Amino acid sequence: MTGNEIRESYLKFFEKKGHKILPSASLIPLNDPSILWTAAGMVPFKPFFTGAAKPEYTRVTTCQKCIRTPDIESVGKTARHHTFFEMLGNFSFGDYFKESAIPWAWEFVTEHLRLPADKLWISIFLDDDEAFEIWNKTVGVPAGRIVRMGKDTNFWEIGVGPCGPCSEIYVDLGAERGCGSPECKVGCDCDRFLEIWNLVFIQFFKDEEGNYTPLTSKGIDTGFGLERVASVMQGVPTNFDTDLFREIMDFTAGLFGLKYGVDGRVDVALKVIADHCRAITFAVADGALPSNEGRGYVIRRLLRRAVRFGRLLGIEDPFLHEVSGAVVRQMGRVYPELVTQREHVFRVIRREEERFGETLAQGTEMLNRLIAEARQAGSAVVSGEDAFRLYDTYGFPLELTQEMAGEQGLTVDTDGFGRAMEEQRQRARSARQETDYISGRDAMFKKMREEVGETVFVGYDALEATGRVLRIVQGGKRLESAQAGEEVEFILDVTPFYAESGGQVSDRGKVTAADLEVEIHEVTKPVENLFVHRGKVVAGILKEHDTVTARVDPARRAATCRNHSATHLLHKALKEVLGGHVNQAGSLVEPERLRFDFTHYAAATPEELQKVEELVNRMVLSALPVEAFETSLAEARKMGAAALFGEKYGERVRVVKMGDFSLELCGGTHLRNTAEVGLFKLLGESSVGAGLRRIEAVTGEGALSYVKAKEEQLAEIARLVKAAPHEAVRRVEGLLQTVRDLEAENEALQARLARYQVQDLMDRLREVKGVKVLAGQAAAPDMDSLRGMVDLLRDRVGSGVIVLGSAGENRVNLVAAVTKDLVEKGLHAGKLVKELAPVVGGGGGGRPEMAQAGGKDPSRLKEALEKTYKAVESQLK
């Protein structure tokens, strides 16, 4: 079976078992700062397992795109390690449990994949008798083929939250693939027993004290690795030999005029390139961009490693963007986002390859210098520390350093490299804090929601609502009441306050009753449909169960709505002006301003920004109606609604439509008509990372204030240049031209003065041990002028040492130059100024040919210059 056939067969099998087939979530996790990547099939469903959100379906099956990067250096060298892989899975949220999950897994592998039952082994958690009974009695697996294993391998848990035992299906690949030990069995580190399916039975909740409580609503989370299963079904020794990789590897080999399977060294490089290019292509299509931190650093590191292995195969020009095309051709049918984002992906990869080419040249220069230094020291070894520095700073793999050093007859201290690598890993482990699947605060509010129920949000249609106080919290502790002066968090059963989410800040306002007044500073939503109001009691007493009136600050809400609706117009305008590749990468919507991050390869030109601003304002003047409605995710996609990369949407979504111009999935608050924006004004555009740009803007009263401030600045400039405002630009241009003319005249005078001074200074030329030495004081306004005079003197002298000094108020400049022939005899300008600078209370240094220094004591400049001759004499000894 091909990889595509296995994928399709799995999904259809579970669809017939009542599961909803859902598309893969983005590789960029939604609202989960604890992880960089979606690394398992269950990650998109974590809120359902933790109880933080309610699922649309209780049975789901997916083929999830995944990235894992802890073992990057192993990729290409082992049979199974990958950075990108596909994880098939079937999930139950409070529906079926072991009694169905186990028999279905067995049915699929034996009847649909037709794997021989006598080649299959089962592992279970040590104490999971229930799973044993189902495997043995219901399914019919002999007891001798069911292996009980410990908590370290067969119990799934991550910090506080849901957890449970797991059971795995292994395929026996034959004794010839094993370690030869008579003790070889399931769980052995050799390649004989290959795990293809992991079934996790989520049946406990682990609290902060480490206690395990049975869950009333149990869950199933399974992982069925497509690449591994394909290797078994296709009878090949490694995942790389499956059809999932071979097309990409053969294409890459063709670029180099090579063949896979002939040379082991070539094969490793082809595997690395294919694996890493799959990861890069999918990640960039999902919105990741190369950078120096976070997931962007992972992308950059993978790309550089792939390019370096290309260099080992002899290719110097950018090529990875072409390999990316092979990835799109092979997988675009299953993952249509690859096709729609193809041009964006190619441009990002090509630009990053070119940038790395420049970095690689710098690294090569450094390595050549290290090799030269090792030879001078009489060593034939490049130290492990230096090799690691090349790896860490310039992205040189150890293999490339070894190859280049080997060409020069040197070796590399690989043990030292390994120690340096491990030290960095230890530092990273120390710096990294383990993040629980669900924080203590979120767990508290999840439990609270179970006790008091959810909050009904009415803020789309009303700015005032009557509600009941369900719970009051302070510092994580429940309060029955809060007095005036206290800051607390509390939950209402009904609220008009928008909770901070989707880049939009929360509403502010007041909660009141007869004698009560609470100022609301912030509203959050730690778990789905639970609105937590944080505020200060300024009068009266806030009590549980009291009925109160919640009022949103209308002016603040209106200003926020203006900026949010303008953000949608801006997003669409950027796509119209810059191209369809533009996608939202983040935003901040607050009453005072808006900030919008988007994907683009270069700074927008002033002309492009002007077009964007004009288009947005044209849509404002068009008075487009703004509508918000709910529909299914599938229907919204059919309509062409824009969605945020990395966002995980439920089956029902809210769509915001602005005439026929803009259509986006959005849960924020908006205007009724674009005319209410009033005026849209761009403040600026800047870079926030490679391929990532940022625009800041204001609307309404904020835009009006900005324009008025600019008018006042123009009026002040006009006053200063003594012109009418409409003539100010012409007047300033005239003044600037006058300044340029005067500067040119001044430069000419300075050059003439320098030539006169050079003639006078030549009279100070002396000989020291047969070497011409000139040291003198010059009238030079700055260091650049002084260097220019030194260059003139060096040309006049031909062979010699020149030292010039200039003095200003509490300032001394020194410049020294040594001609090349004398550098070869041991004279060094840098050492010379280091000796002279302390005389004038300063310091400096530089290259053997040219150096400079500064000081603070002009009164001793003559003394320093006179010392030049003895210093040169000393260097000539």
Swiss-Prot record:
Asked if the record carries the keyword Nucleotide-binding, the reply is yes
Residue spans crossing the bilayer? none
Q: Report if keyword Cytoplasm is assigned.
A: yes
Which EC class is this protein assigned? ligase
What Enzyme Commission number(s) appear in the record?
Answer: 6.1.1.7
Which cofactor(s) does the record list? Answer: Zn(2+)
Q: What does the cofactor field's note say?
A: Binds 1 zinc ion per subunit.
Task: Give the UniProt keywords, A-Z.
Answer: Aminoacyl-tRNA synthetase, ATP-binding, Cytoplasm, Ligase, Metal-binding, Nucleotide-binding, Protein biosynthesis, RNA-binding, tRNA-binding, Zinc
Which InterPro entries does the protein's record reference? aa-tRNA-synth_II/BPL/LPL, Ala-tRNA-lgiase_IIc, Ala-tRNA-ligase_IIc_anticod-bd, Ala-tRNA-synth_IIc_core, Ala-tRNA-synth_IIc_N, Ala-tRNA_ligase, Ala_tRNA_ligase_euk/bac, DHHA1_dom
Q: Name one Pfam family in it.
A: DHHA1
- Its main subcellular localisation, reduced to a broad class, is cytoplasm
Localization (cell): Cytoplasm
The Gene Ontology biological process annotation of the record reads:
alanyl-tRNA aminoacylation
One GO cellular component term of this record is: cytosol
The molecular function terms in GO held by this entry are: alanine-tRNA ligase activity; aminoacyl-tRNA deacylase activity; ATP binding; catalytic activity, acting on a protein; transferase activity; tRNA binding; zinc ion binding
Coiled-coil spans are: none
Where is Zn(2+) annotated to bind?
Answer: 564, 568, 666, 670
Q: What family is this?
A: Belongs to the class-II aminoacyl-tRNA synthetase family.
Domain remarks:
Consists of three domains; the N-terminal catalytic domain, the editing domain and the C-terminal C-Ala domain. The editing domain removes incorrectly charged amino acids, while the C-Ala domain, along with tRNA(Ala), serves as a bridge to cooperatively bring together the editing and aminoacylation centers thus stimulating deacylation of misacylated tRNAs.
What is the annotated role of this protein in its UniProt record?
Answer: Catalyzes the attachment of alanine to tRNA(Ala) in a two-step reaction: alanine is first activated by ATP to form Ala-AMP and then transferred to the acceptor end of tRNA(Ala). Also edits incorrectly charged Ser-tRNA(Ala) and Gly-tRNA(Ala) via its editing domain.
Q: Can you say what this protein is called? A: Alanine--tRNA ligase
Which species is listed as the source? Pelotomaculum thermopropionicum (strain DSM 13744 / JCM 10971 / SI)
